[in-house]
From Swiss-Prot:
It comes from Heliobacterium modesticaldum (strain ATCC 51547 / Ice1). It is an enzyme of class 1 (oxidoreductase). Keywords: 4Fe-4S, ATP-binding, Bacteriochlorophyll biosynthesis, Chlorophyll biosynthesis, Iron, Iron-sulfur, Magnesium, Metal-binding, Nucleotide-binding, Oxidoreductase, Photosynthesis. It catalyses: chlorophyllide a + oxidized 2[4Fe-4S]-[ferredoxin] + 2 ADP + 2 phosphate = protochlorophyllide a + reduced 2[4Fe-4S]-[ferredoxin] + 2 ATP + 2 H2O. This is Light-independent protochlorophyllide reductase iron-sulfur ATP-binding protein. ATP binds at residues 10-15, 39, 181-182. The gene is bchL. Homodimer. Protochlorophyllide reductase is composed of three subunits; BchL, BchN and BchB.
Length: 287
């Protein structure tokens, strides 16, 4: 199973993806996480360090693909999760999306991807360009990470549009659902997921331990082993992992028009306004 995780920059995609990867690995699956961001920090909490990127390795071997072995690219980290970082060109030059596409080609050439039960792409995704949309061409399912605010949901909707476009082009990728992250409330998230007709997979509250885990280089599951009070959040990730491993059908989201996005949360019939007594349909939920 291949899962592509998208979301607005800074929304917590990497933290979410890493904890999902560990939750899945703890069920006995072989898991590979591929970081697709020029920052190259997607897998920091799993590897416990910044690992060499594909770009750096290609440069080391003078771009002789035939000289590269799987062990040059893949690092095994916490809970047996294996990780790869694409890296990217220097700031202000080149195309990071192109690097993502070339990384996938290299992993396929080395027959790396077939060695895992579950592969998670952690993808930069404010506005998905062609290169950063490449994982959608390989993925069975996509997940969108969003906080409960307009800018994050606007980016989420653009990702939904990319999923619709990929299906129109013949690719069979479906949206598994939206993951709420750093959420004190979920009103906007629930309105959005109802509108696009997709599940709200789970909600991770705003929490200091989560922020500290990222800084210290630990997943939440490691903090749990250290006795930190994070069991509520690890339980949420276990629930989401179980949902993904059930291989849900997913949906082609009913993406919202750009202009409608600016009106969606201003309507008088939104549940928290309650001015006209309308009751919105329930958000699809994860079993």
């Amino acid at each position: 199973m291949i899962i592509a995780v998208y979301g607005k920059g800074g929304v917590g995609k990497s933290t979410t993806t890493s904890n999902l990867a560990v939750a899945i690995a703890k069920t006995g699956r072989r898991v590979l996480q591929i970081g697709c961001d020029p920052k190259s920090d997607s897998t920091f909490t799993i590897a416990g360090r910044m690992i060499p990127t594909v770009v750096e390795i290609l440069d080391k071997f003078n771009y002789h693909y035939e000289s590269i072995e799987p062990d040059d690219l893949v690092v095994q980290g916490y809970a047996g999760v294996c990780v790869v970082e694409t890296g990217g060109p220097p700031a202000g030059s080149g195309c990071g999306g192109y690097v993502v596409g070339e990384t996938v080609k290299l992993l396929e050439k080395l027959d790396i991807m077939r060695q895992y039960d579950v592969i998670l792409f952690d993808v930069l995704g404010d506005v998905v360009c062609g290169g950063f949309a490449t994982p959608l061409q390989y993925a069975d399912l996509a997940c969108i990470v969003s906080s409960n605010d307009f800018d994050a949901l606007f980016a989420a909707n653009r990702i939904c549009e990319s999923i619709v476009e990929k299906n129109a082009s013949g690719y069979d990728v479906k949206l598994a659902g939206v993951i709420g992250n750093r959420c004190d409330q979920v009103d906007l998230l629930e309105t959005f997921t109802r509108r696009i007709e997709a599940p709200l997979m789970g909600v991770v509250p705003r929490n200091e331990e989560v922020r500290q885990s990222r800084v210290k280089g630990y997943t939440l599951f490691e903090l749990e082993e250290m006795g930190e009070p994070v069991s509520e959040m690890t339980g949420e990730f276990r629930k989401m992992a179980a949902y993904l491993l059930s291989q849900p059908d997913g949906v082609v989201p009913n993406a919202v028009g750009t202009r409608e996005m600016f009106e969606l949360f201003r309507g008088e019939d939104l549940p928290w306004k309650g001015s006209n007594g309308k009751t919105a349909a329930s958000t699809p939920s994860v079993p």
